[in-house]
Amino acid sequence: MMQTVLAKIVADKAIWVEARKQQQPLASFQNEVQPSTRHFYDALQGARTAFILECKKASPSKGVIRDDFDPARIAAIYKHYASAISVLTDEKYFQGSFNFLPIVSQIAPQPILCKDFIIDPYQIYLARYYQADACLLMLSVLDDDQYRQLAAVAHSLEMGVLTEVSNEEEQERAIALGAKVVGINNRDLRDLSIDLNRTRELAPKLGHNVTVISESGINTYAQVRELSHFANGFLIGSALMAHDDLHAAVRRVLLGENKVCGLTRGQDAKAAYDAGAIYGGLIFVATSPRCVNVEQAQEVMAAAPLQYVGVFRNHDIADVVDKAKVLSLAAVQLHGNEEQLYIDTLREALPAHVAIWKALSVGETLPAREFQHVDKYVLDNGQGGSGQRFDWSLLNGQSLGNVLLAGGLGADNCVEAAQTGCAGLDFNSAVESQPGIKDARLLASVFQTLRAY
């Protein structure tokens, strides 16, 4: 099926190119085209895994992905995380535009990749005129002579080339053609299915001189950690564009869905957010040394745009609902022996957007995670706040996409904890100088360690 879709896209692209040449002839702007000064190849080098983050409004497989598509706003967020930024410029199938390129380039200092079905040198001159620093060349669309001609034009303008392959034959061609950066598309061009094994199979054959980028189907930190053994970097678009909170979406993939719990001071919330946390925990349990009241919680929340989670233990349901509403909490976390009836009643009473998390104590065995209306589980040793870890080998083979791991997590063990495959980690006592007082250096160290791949 997809070969015909791809053939149709390319046929339509040829028509588009001819029309654009009439509307904006090469002679009308070629003298204004300056070589790029942002080096795509260099940007993807270095010890850490590279990320090409993509501005994408729609796609043939998903339709419109982001309704409020604002390239300036997206670039202002991506610039904090990306090695390079990809911009879809295909109009018919991806609702892209060449006009997006200068908008993104003006806001973000990274190299900008023009992502399109490029079949004519004209498109490369056009991309550079609109401030692109690199372009995509797809071996599924181009023969070797076309590729050489187009790559030569790009390099003459000091632009980089992302050479895309999707099977072994194209991978061998990429090597023979001397491609410096090869993108392995995990999407099957025939049926649009995703197979991450494609990266595992093709990457080792590309050799050490080639920078390998894994494309399509990457949407979790666990996938990134595992595939970073095969690829030098990742191109990620749809997994980010589908989320309203773009900062959180990027952090979720680069670092995991991590929470810093037991916040009592605004400066600690800011340090947690600056380090890379998504969630901030506010404890309303009177026996905790980190307990806060509503006024203190409001002070903490005003300091940083974390998604705040209220922590309760066997509280009266009306009290939980009241605090969730007054503070506009993202979630409530239940740390006592709340049963299904309590959870059902709470779900009825809470605003629909407030999630319910349930903390479970892990002893010799892993407790069942079978509650209705529970969105996430926090697995901890004991009742929480003990600073001790349980036997993580119990997590082997478990489906952990809605689980946060807690208990004594710090810079010394966070990587091992992340490798359990949990969606995220819950930090508390090991990032403190004393109970309730977070240490900004310890927080920074934890998140730098999580990003050291």
From Swiss-Prot:
Family stated for the protein in its record: In the N-terminal section; belongs to the TrpC family.
InterPro entries recorded: Aldolase_TIM, Indole-3-glycerol_P_synth, Indole-3-glycerol_P_synth_dom, Indole-3-GlycerolPSynthase_CS, PRAI_dom, RibuloseP-bd_barrel
Enzyme Commission number, as recorded: 4.1.1.48, 5.3.1.24
Chain positions covered by the region annotation N-(5'-phosphoribosyl)anthranilate isomerase: 258-453
Indole-3-glycerol phosphate synthase: region residues: 1-257
Keyword Cell membrane: no
Biological role stated in the UniProt entry: Bifunctional enzyme that catalyzes two sequential steps of tryptophan biosynthetic pathway. The first reaction is catalyzed by the isomerase, coded by the TrpF domain; the second reaction is catalyzed by the synthase, coded by the TrpC domain.
Keywords: Amino-acid biosynthesis, Aromatic amino acid biosynthesis, Decarboxylase, Isomerase, Lyase, Multifunctional enzyme, Tryptophan biosynthesis
Disulfide links within the chain: none
HAMAP family named among the record's database cross-references: IGPS_B, PRAI
Reaction equation(s) it catalyzes: N-(5-phospho-beta-D-ribosyl)anthranilate = 1-(2-carboxyphenylamino)-1-deoxy-D-ribulose 5-phosphate; 1-(2-carboxyphenylamino)-1-deoxy-D-ribulose 5-phosphate + H(+) = (1S,2R)-1-C-(indol-3-yl)glycerol 3-phosphate + CO2 + H2O
PANTHER family: INDOLE-3-GLYCEROL-PHOSPHATE SYNTHASE, TRYPTOPHAN BIOSYNTHESIS PROTEIN
Alphabetical list of Pfam families matching this protein: IGPS (PF00218), PRAI (PF00697)
Domain of life: Bacteria
Gene Ontology molecular function, alphabetical: indole-3-glycerol-phosphate synthase activity; phosphoribosylanthranilate isomerase activity
Organism: Escherichia coli (strain K12)
PROSITE patterns on file: IGPS
Quaternary structure note: Monomer.
Biological process annotations from GO: L-tryptophan biosynthetic process
Protein name according to UniProt: Tryptophan biosynthesis protein TrpCF
Pathway(s) the chain acts in: Amino-acid biosynthesis; L-tryptophan biosynthesis; L-tryptophan from chorismate: step 3/5; Amino-acid biosynthesis; L-tryptophan biosynthesis; L-tryptophan from chorismate: step 4/5
Lyase keyword on record: yes
